């Protein structure tokens, strides 16, 4: 992987900051297209490093170091190689930049606090969204456990007040090349407000933990993720945090795929499952999805269905639907080109034929909704479905 991270701001200076992962982790370099010279920037940092901006004099870079789901800002002097950590609250940095006067502004959020624009060295935010501020959320706790292959898997927990065990939601991120960070997520806080502990698992295939971790899924999708999510569930039960009779699995997009694949291949131990815009029937999804997604699937599976037919069938949730032993909510957009409607309807029809309890919620949009009222409605649907099947979960207010 190689990508541009921004040209030098000085007129006549053709240098470009670039990013590459050939070391196994994302690292910056400086490239001069005129001379062809490339200088890798040696950094003693354990995580992934991105370039947010140049200083106006082009003598330093503003770096974002991502490690274990949290971000740190640093100033790298390109002349001396000195790395200066910039002080700021813990959390995730969505954007950062250096202003003409040298001030560093950044957009920060955490599990406990909604996004705001802050300046390094300032006590208060410099910009906030208009209107009332979001109420403070429950802070995330860093969480690690061992999977079935002996790997350390990292994630986060958001836990309601009071002693456990709690009804628990495993909220599986999409992507699959994405990761859950210590960042503001109203969905997590909504579940916590209704009495659930929430586990966020950065399964094998997630970004943020190095190239080897991210590439595990190549040629083997739909197995490592499920193993890691199940190991996370079992760890929370062993800790006494999760009630073993009240565990819900949910996720959107690839998280919805993991949800359906988990309840079909590891059917025991789930009280309910909620799959939002999921892949449910892989052969049908491949036929109907956009060309860009077909290319992604070919890279993930090692070929198309004509090349790896048996693998597509084995890693398709509809293949295992007869083993499903928990109520299922399917939520799907009528105009979704990433996880198309028909393949979810195929899965729903198989559930109906088998007499399995399920609900189907269709909405007039694509791969998710951007309209605020629709997103609120969807969250209410999820909470009401969970409450109907999990005795310890609270119903949302009317």
Regions found by a protein language model. Give the residues of each.
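Beta-propeller blade-edge and WD-like acidic-aromatic loop motif
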Residues: 14-40, 59-60, 67-85, 109-127
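Cap/lid segment of the alpha/beta-hydrolase catalytic domain
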Residues: 132-245, 252-253, 287-295
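Conserved beta-propeller blade repeats
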Residues: 1-19, 25-28, 42-64, 90-107, ...
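Active-site-proximal cap/loop segments of hydrolase catalytic domains
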Residues: 203-398
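Non-catalytic accessory segments flanking enzyme active sites
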Residues: 64, 70-71, 83-161, 183-189, ...
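Residues that line or immediately flank small-molecule/substrate-binding pockets and catalytic motifs
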Residues: 20, 65, 108, 121, ...
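Flexible loop/turn segments at secondary-structure boundaries
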Residues: 1-3, 25-26, 48-49, 70-71, ...
């Amino acid at each position: 992987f190689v990508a541009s991270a921004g040209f030098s701001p000085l007129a006549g200076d053709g240098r470009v900051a670039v990013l590459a992962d050939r070391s196994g982790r994302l690292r910056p370099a400086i490239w001069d297209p005129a001379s062809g010279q490339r200088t890798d920037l040696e950094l003693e940092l354990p995580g992934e490093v991105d370039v947010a901006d140049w200083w106006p004099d082009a003598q330093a870079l503003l770096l974002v170091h991502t490690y274990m789901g949290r971000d740190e800002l640093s100033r790298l002097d390109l002349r001396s190689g000195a790395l200066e950590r910039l002080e700021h609250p813990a959390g995730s940095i969505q954007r950062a930049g250096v202003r003409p006067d040298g001030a560093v502004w950044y957009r920060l959020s955490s599990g406990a606090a909604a996004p705001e624009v802050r300046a390094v060295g300032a006590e208060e935010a410099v910009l906030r969204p208009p209107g009332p501020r979001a109420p403070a959320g429950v802070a995330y706790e860093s969480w690690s456990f061992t999977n079935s292959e002996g790997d350390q898997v990292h994630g986060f927990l958001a836990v309601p007040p009071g002693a456990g065990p709690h009804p628990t939601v495993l909220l599986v991120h999409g992507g699959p090349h994405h990761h859950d960070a210590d960042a503001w997520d109203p969905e997590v806080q909504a579940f916590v407000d209704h009495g659930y502990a929430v586990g966020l698992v950065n399964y094998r295939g997630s970004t943020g933990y190095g190239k080897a971790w991210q590439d595990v899924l190549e040629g083997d999708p739909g197995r490592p993720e499920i193993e890691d999510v199940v190991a996370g569930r079992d760890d929370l039960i062993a800790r006494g945090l999760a009630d073993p009779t009240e565990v819900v699995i949910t996720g959107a997009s690839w998280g919805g795929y993991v949800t359906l694949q988990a309840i079909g291949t590891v059917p025991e131990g789930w009280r309910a499952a909620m799959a939002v815009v999921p892949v449910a029937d892989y052969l049908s999804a491949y036929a109907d999805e956009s060309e860009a997604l077909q290319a992604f699937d070919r890279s993930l599976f090692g070929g198309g269905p004509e090349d790896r037919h048996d693998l597509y069938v084995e890693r398709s949730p509809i293949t295992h639907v007869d083993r499903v032993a928990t109520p299922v909510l399917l939520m799907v957009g009528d105009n979704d080109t990433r996880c198309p409607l028909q393949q979810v309807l195929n899965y729903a029809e198989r559930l109906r034929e088998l007499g399995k309890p399920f609900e189907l919620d269709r909405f007039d949009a694509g791969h998710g909704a951007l309209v605020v009222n629709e997103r609120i409605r969807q969250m209410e649907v999820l909470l009401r479905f969970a409450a109907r099947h999990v005795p310890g979960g609270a119903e949302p207010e009317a």
